[in-house]
């Protein structure tokens, strides 16, 4: 597994990400290697020359109640269907946690419907009122305020996630 700054990706890497992403999220296919917004970094996991695991990463702050947290947000995490249930996703999450522990990150944060997978990998499920910039097809539609129940966080620096409204201070991953 390697982490690349977005700006350093090759055309071939973008093409491989687009193919895996679209195969993994058929209801959200697009003709680019990202869905809503370019992530700051890309995590690529290859077996030979085939991309078998991918996730986008965004580093920023969010506000929870009166607390400000530095978060590493995960977007579009996917593993090639032919190699799922072989530990690739779990290994990628473990390596991501190791990476984050060497950086100034309070929590890893993501949105997913895969509850058992993330709970088994040390994430906590949250149910909280959240606000974020609603973005679709390169256009913003204002600020959304909704209850989210498919949000997961993993503490990296021993902090406890505060109770309260989550302000994403931008778009949601």
What do these predicted ranges mean?
Residues 58-59, 92-96, 131-138:
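Short acidic (Asp/Glu) patches
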Residues 133-173:
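C-terminal "cap" of GNAT-fold acetyltransferases
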Residues 3-78:
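A conserved beta-strand-loop-helix scaffold within acyl/acetyltransferase catalytic domains
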Residues 24, 99, 117:
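Short alpha-helical functional segments enriched in proximate histidine and acidic residues
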Residues 79, 85-98:
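Conserved acetyl-CoA-binding loop-helix of GNAT-fold acetyltransferases
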Residues 48-50, 82, 155-160:
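Short loop segments at secondary-structure junctions
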Residues 102-106, 112-137:
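Conserved active-site alpha-helix within GNAT-family acetyltransferase domains
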